[in-house]
Amino acid sequence: MSQEKYIMAIDQGTTSSRAIIFNQKGEKVSSSQKEFPQIFPHAGWVEHNANQIWNSVQSVIAGAFIESSIKPSQIEAIGITNQRETTVVWDKKTGVPIYNAIVWQSRQTAPIAEQLKQDGHTKMIHEKTGLVIDAYFSATKIRWILDHVPGAQERAEKGELLFGTIDTWLVWKLTDGAVHVTDYSNAARTMLYNIKDLTWDDEILELLNIPKDMLPEVKSNSEIYGKTAAFHFYGGEVPISGMAGDQQAALFGQLAFEPGMVKNTYGTGSFIIMNTGDEMQLSSNNLLTTIGYGIGGKVHYALEGSIFIAGSAIQWLRDGLKMIETSPESEQFALASTSDDEVYVVPAFTGLGAPYWDSNARGSVFGLTRGTSKEDFVKATLQSIAYQVRDVIDTMQVDSGIDIQQLRVDGGAAMNNMLMQFQADILGIDIARAKNLETTALGAAFLAGLAVGYWEDMDALKELNATGQLFKASMNESRKEKLYKGWKRAVKATQVFTQEEDADDDAK
C-alpha cells in the first residue's frame, strides 16, 4: 500500500517562519513556527540575519515532520511564500551574505528614493514597474548595500555576488546553490522589473548601476524550479514547484482567479488586492499595480492598496490604552455600544496608507461628547478599519472600471463578526470569510501542487477553500453614506491639522 502524499508550504514572514503540511483536501495536518531576531541598527532601520532566517526554516521543516510523523518521502512538492521586498545580497561561491537582509519596512534607503524622485524618474518607473518610488521596494536596498559594503560594487560587476528576495534565498539554500530564481510576484516588487514586458528593465538597472548578472531568473508562480538537496531536506529530494509573495499567495489561496475578485487580509495592517486580469492597469489614485500570479504562460495583473493600521489598532486598545484585556474582547465591547456611530477614530499612527499616502498624518479622534463611553471608543476603532478598506475598494473601482460584488477576507481581525458585518454594511457588498484562514500558506501549496499534478487544475481547487461565513449588507443607503461622509471629513481634518503644524514649523 502506497503512503499518502502531502504538500508542504514554507511561509517565511517578517517575524517568524512557518512550515505547514496540507493534504489533498487542502486541510492542514501539521505545522511548526519559529520566531527569529529583529535587528534595529538605527531609528527607522530594520534588518534580519539571512542565515538566521534559513536556520528558522530548517527548524520548522523538522518541526512539521516531527509533529505529524510524516516523512520527507511523503512530500510531493514544496511551495514557498514570503515577506516581500526584503533584500539579500550574498557571495556566489561561499553563500555568505555580505550584509544583513534589509527588511521591507526599513527606511534606511529613503534618501536614494528621494533622489530618484528629485531627478524626475517617477513617471518612468511607475509606467514600467507599476510602483511608486519608495524605500519599501528592493531596488534602493540593493543600491544601499553596494554603496555601503566595501568592494561590493566591484565584486557585483565581476559576477561574484547574487541578489534575491527571501523566496530566492530559500530556494538557493534548499537546492544547495544549484538554483537562482524568483517568481513574477516577487520580481514585481523589486522596482527593477518591467511588468509589461516581463523582463528586468535595463534602463532602471543602468540608472541605479545594478549589474544584471546579480539578478535571479524570473519564472512563473507554478512550475518545478529545482529539487531540494537531500541533506537540506532530511534525506528527501523534493520538487520546489510553487512560489509567490505573501499577499499574492493569499489572493491565490482565496481562489480569486477572475478579474474583479478581491481579497483583503486583516493583519497588523490590511492588504487589499484585486485581480484585474491580463491587462496591466496603472492606477491614477495611488494604488500599486503589480502581478497577481502567472501560470502556464498567462499573467494576471492586480491592483494593491496597503493600509498601515488594522489589527494593530486593536492591539493599541489592549496594550496602549488598556481598554480591553484581549483582542477578541473588542467585539463584545463594540456590540455593547449604544452610540449612533458619531465618534470617529483615524488611526494614522504611522501616517495614512492607500489611497492617501500621507506619511505626515497622525492619529486623531472626532465626535467625543460627555456621554461617550469606552464601548463607543472601541467600536469607533473597529469601524476605522472598515472605513479604510472602503477608501481602497472605492478607489479600485474607479481605477479598474470593475464593479466589485464581493470581498474575500482572511487574517486575524477577520474573525471579529461585528467588524465583518460593519464592513459589509459600509461597502454595501457581501463579505466572504474563508473557511480555512491559512490562505497565504494554502496559496503557496496550491501553486506547488498544480505544478506536479497533485491537483489536476484550478477548477479542482475551487472545492477546497469554501466560504466559511457570508456577511450580507443590511444598512440602508442613506445611513451608510452619512457615516462614510463623516469618516471622510475626519480624515480631511486629520490631514489639515498636520499640514498646519508643518506650516507653523516653517514659519519659525
Swiss-Prot record:
GO cellular component annotations of the record: cytosol
Gene Ontology biological process terms in this record: glycerol catabolic process; glycerol metabolic process; glycerol-3-phosphate metabolic process
A GO term for molecular function: glycerol kinase activity
Mechanisms controlling activity: Activated by phosphorylation and inhibited by fructose 1,6-bisphosphate (FBP).
Domain of life per record: Bacteria
InterPro entries reported in the protein's UniProt record: ATPase_NBD, Carb_kinase_FGGY, Carb_kinase_FGGY_CS, FGGY_C, FGGY_N, Glycerol_kin
Binding site for glycerol: R84, E85, Y136, D246, Q247
Reaction(s) the record says it catalyses: glycerol + ATP = sn-glycerol 3-phosphate + ADP + H(+)
UniProt binding sites for sn-glycerol 3-phosphate: T14, R84, E85, Y136, D246
Binding site for ATP: T14, T15, S16, T268, G311, Q315, G412
Keywords: ATP-binding, Glycerol metabolism, Kinase, Nucleotide-binding, Phosphoprotein, Transferase
Post-translation changes: The phosphoenolpyruvate-dependent sugar phosphotransferase system (PTS), including enzyme I, and histidine-containing protein (HPr) are required for the phosphorylation, which leads to the activation of the enzyme.
Subunit relationships: Homotetramer and homodimer (in equilibrium).
HAMAP family in UniProt: Glycerol_kin
NCBIfam families: glycerol_kin (TIGR01311), PRK00047.1 (NF000756)
Annotated protein name in UniProt: Glycerol kinase
Species per Swiss-Prot/TrEMBL record: Streptococcus pyogenes serotype M18 (strain MGAS8232)
Origin organism lineage: Bacteria, Bacillati, Bacillota, Bacilli, Lactobacillales
